[in-house]
């Protein structure tokens, strides 16, 4: 008898791309393909484990592998749970989940005039609700969640390029994102900080038309009592968190900084926090201002 072969961990990066129907899985697959990944679209969940095993074979010539999967082909979570139990999580095996609001998904399905794959004889919202309920455990098991509600296909492709190109040696990719609470808290945020404890430059006429990127606004915001103290204390508090992410092989983190409209305080603080986090070892930082220009 032949001895039973031991399980090999993936030798290439393997990413499982999933999420809500209409949230942009195909766009992400195309973007990864442009970055040199070998992309398998609409892979049946039952084929996930053989694909990961293939990536674990020494000498395989496949590049980085991405499998785009939805929930229609079987019990996805049981398959995913089996894979994570067998191979473990780590820098070579990741799960990317694409999220979007109900309103954004309804708008996209209506634009293409197609039914939701799970709506059956019900409404479009019924299908979305059914899928969202199925995906709760998968979302919680994901390494990275991207909310595509406010992104068009070009912006989503750019986001994927920023996240997955050219920094394989970075321990953690951190996105510092400013936002306005009146537009909703980012669904993909790992941590959220509220800047509404600071005076609002909106009520200063000469600052109102400017943004937190402008020096006058930045000086005003960071010059308020407690502002600089908060930013530096928050950066110090994040340092051991991000170091822990690296130890646990969590390669992405989104830190959301909010104010009322996402134009002044959150933008200024996000820029300052980003500059401090860039000094941390093993951390690659990008800064995004989700709601600039919405007013």
Curated annotation (Swiss-Prot):
HAMAP family linked: RapZ_like (MF_00636)
Any single Pfam family the record assigns to this protein: RapZ-like_N
Residues binding ATP, per UniProt: 19-26
Keyword Nucleotide-binding applies: yes
Protein's name according to its UniProt entry: Nucleotide-binding protein CMS1991
Keyword Ribonucleoprotein annotated: no
Function as written in the Swiss-Prot or TrEMBL entry: Displays ATPase and GTPase activities.
UniProt keyword terms in alphabetical order: ATP-binding, GTP-binding, Nucleotide-binding
MF GO annotations: ATP binding; GTP binding
InterPro entries assigned to the protein according to its UniProt record, in alphabetical order: P-loop_NTPase (IPR027417), RapZ-like (IPR005337), RapZ-like_N (IPR053930), RapZ_C (IPR053931)
Residues binding GTP, per UniProt: 70-73
Gene3D superfamilies with a match to the protein in the record: P-loop containing nucleotide triphosphate hydrolases (3.40.50.300)
Family listed: Belongs to the RapZ-like family.
């Amino acid at each position: 008898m032949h001895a039973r072969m031991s399980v090999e961990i993936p030798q290439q990066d393997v990413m499982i791309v999933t999420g809500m129907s209409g949230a942009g899985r195909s766009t992400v697959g195309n973007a990864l393909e442009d970055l040199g990944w070998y992309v398998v679209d609409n892979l049946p969940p039952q084929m996930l484990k053989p694909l990961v095993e293939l990536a674990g074979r020494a000498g395989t010539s496949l590049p980085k592998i991405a499998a785009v999967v939805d929930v229609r082909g079987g019990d996805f979570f049981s398959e995913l749970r089996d894979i994570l139990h067998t191979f473990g999580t780590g820098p070579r095996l990741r799960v990317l989940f694409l999220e979007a609001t109900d309103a954004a998904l309804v708008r996209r399905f209506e634009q293409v005039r197609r039914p939701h794959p799970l709506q059956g004889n019900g409404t479009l919202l019924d299908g979305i609700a059914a899928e969202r309920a199925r995906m709760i455990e998968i979302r919680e098991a994901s390494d990275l969640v991207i909310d595509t509600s406010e992104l068009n296909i070009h912006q989503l492709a750019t986001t994927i390029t920023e996240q997955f190109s050219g920094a394989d040696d970075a321990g953690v990719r951190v996105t510092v994102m400013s936002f306005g609470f009146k537009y909703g808290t980012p669904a993909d945020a790992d941590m959220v900080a509220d800047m509404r404890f600071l005076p609002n430059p909106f009520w200063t006429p000469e600052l109102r038309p400017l943004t937190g990127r402008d020096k006058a606004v930045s000086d005003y915001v960071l010059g308020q009592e407690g502002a600089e103290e908060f930013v530096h204390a928050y950066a110090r508090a994040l340092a051991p968190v991000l170091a822990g992410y690296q130890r646990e092989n969590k390669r992405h983190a989104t830190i959301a900084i909010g104010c009322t409209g996402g134009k002044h305080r959150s933008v200024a603080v996000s820029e300052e926090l980003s500059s401090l986090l860039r000094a941390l070892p093993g951390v690659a930082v990008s800064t995004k201002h989700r709601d600039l220009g919405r007013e």
